[in-house]
């Protein structure tokens, strides 16, 4: 049996949407802008507030709620999640999570189950987040894995950073306090606490707690001597 062609998939979406046109028309009449109703799939259970824009090839599933003035898509799937006011989600997947106000998600971000972000968070290309809390103004813009982390406000996660949360048997949590800077290509071996206003130098491997206002570098990461 041949796999369905992209044309058949779009025909299926069109057929489904024709039966759901009442819900889509209701959304449009309420002030939601849907750029191409023939390429999106929006389940009846989805709530979208006025002022939001839904771009082509977007799938909105389950108990999803999109707050006002958000831009979703293109090529985005959101399932059982809440997207805060004024947020933008581009070429990304979000499942079972809550995104705060004025977030920028994507392109190519994967936000997995039980993730919560505060306001003004930025998660960029090829960043995966799972079961984590991300504080306001924090950012991870490139090529990172953040799993089982409590991330406080104004934290910068450099490109290539990995939080190694699984030891082969058990998942462990890491806590990163406010105003922490994590340099590129760092590895954080959970469970550790990286305290406020500290710096982890590029390429470091963190295996122990980092004190407040401390700078650590190396493998394993040690306090930088001045």
Regions found by a protein language model. Name each.
Residues 205-207:
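Leucine-rich solenoid repeat scaffolds
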């Amino acid at each position: 049996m041949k796999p369905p062609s992209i044309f058949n998939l779009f025909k299926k979406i069109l057929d489904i949407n024709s039966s759901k046109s009442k819900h889509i028309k209701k959304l449009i009449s309420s002030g939601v802008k849907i750029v191409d109703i023939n390429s999106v799939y929006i389940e009846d259970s989805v709530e979208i507030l006025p002022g939001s824009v839904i771009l082509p090839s977007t799938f909105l599933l389950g108990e999803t709620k999109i707050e006002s003035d958000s831009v979703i898509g293109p090529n985005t799937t959101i399932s059982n999640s809440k997207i805060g006011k004024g947020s933008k989600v581009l070429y990304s997947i979000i499942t079972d999570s809550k995104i705060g106000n004025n977030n920028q998600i994507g392109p190519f971000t994967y936000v997995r189950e039980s993730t919560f972000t505060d306001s003004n968070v930025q998660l960029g290309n090829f960043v995966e987040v799972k079961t984590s809390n991300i504080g306001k103004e924090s950012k991870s813009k490139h090529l990172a894995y953040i799993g089982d982390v409590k991330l406080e406000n104004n934290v910068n996660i450099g490109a290539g950073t990995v939080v190694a949360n699984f030891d082969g048997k058990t998942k462990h949590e890491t806590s990163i306090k406010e105003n922490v800077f994590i340099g590129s290509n760092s590895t954080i071996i959970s469970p550790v606490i990286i305290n406020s206003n500290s710096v982890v130098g590029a390429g470091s491997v963190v295996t122990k707690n980092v004190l407040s206002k401390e700078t650590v570098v190396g493998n394993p990461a040690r306090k930088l001597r001045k």
